[in-house]
């Protein structure tokens, strides 16, 4: 893939697009189809097999918006709801590594990525941590339906 035929990667901040290309090469079919729709402001349901890039298909545009200042940090901007705590923990892990890579790309270019916190909340989340989330909300909250109902 050359710089002239990146397609949907052109939607993203150049540092995020370059990071993605370096880390993953070309976008998957799911990502190619999802990103323009998400960037256009539409609601999207992504259903695809494991390992097809769903997590970044769903989250990368929001991360881009936080990174560029289009969405101000300091409150929940991206909400992911799943009934499975194990899946929520996997999603969190699968977001932290890309965020580290994107942050490194920004630092290498002499820029600072705004703080983007990714936290999970479930019935098992200690009360002290829930209170801390209320005082200092994460930009990305991954939660269960039961916990969302209590927020």
Residue ranges and their predicted role:
Residues 3-29:
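Dynamic helix-loop-helix/coil hinge segments at AAA+ ATPase domain boundaries and subdomain interfaces
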Residues 17, 24-151:
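Conserved P-loop/Walker A NTP-binding site and adjacent catalytic elements of P-loop NTPases
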Residues 1-3, 128:
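Compositionally biased, low-hydrophobicity segments enriched in charged and small polar residues
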